[in-house]
């Protein structure tokens, strides 16, 4: 039997309903479905401290690994609603000055390599995009949404059919959240 308890800080609340865990805190809320056969996720409201409990009766390696994965997901959710996740990106161009802007729930890149048409990608979830000159900062409570938005922006400016040693224009991730949840 494998059992793991992740303590919930005072300013954070957690709730499980229909296999979905919702964690709410000062920076917003994150909901994620945590389902695997014979693995249960529950909120233990003990007198000392609340905790998210992940447990299973199985002893095989795959189920134990899933418990560890769920533990990481819950820790990331708690970190996201308390401190948030942040990515930093840098706009780099040598040939044509490109403009990056936010319009509604889309990031728009204009004049990339002199193109007439603008390139667009959606902003995922509750991700907040701030543009300050050549720096783009993405923040939000969901690690997956912030990371995928950063990856989408980076892929949007991928150079194809040209020598990438010469054409290095693009928007590149310069700083990611460090492993270990910080």
UniProtKB/Swiss-Prot annotation:
Keyword Nucleotide-binding in annotation: no
Any one biological process term the GO annotation gives: cytoplasmic translation
A Pfam family the protein falls into: Ribosomal_L6
Sorted UniProt keywords: Ribonucleoprotein, Ribosomal protein, RNA-binding, rRNA-binding
GO cellular component: cytosolic large ribosomal subunit
Gene Ontology molecular function: any one: rRNA binding
Record note on quaternary structure: Part of the 50S ribosomal subunit.
Function: This protein binds to the 23S rRNA, and is important in its secondary structure. It is located near the subunit interface in the base of the L7/L12 stalk, and near the tRNA binding site of the peptidyltransferase center.
Entries under PANTHER family matching the protein: 60S RIBOSOMAL PROTEIN L9 (PTHR11655:SF16), 60S/50S RIBOSOMAL PROTEIN L6/L9 (PTHR11655)
Family that this chain belongs to: Belongs to the universal ribosomal protein uL6 family.
Family matches, as HAMAP family: Ribosomal_uL6_A
Official protein name in the record: Large ribosomal subunit protein uL6
The species this protein was found in: Haloquadratum walsbyi (strain DSM 16790 / HBSQ001)
Gene: rpl6
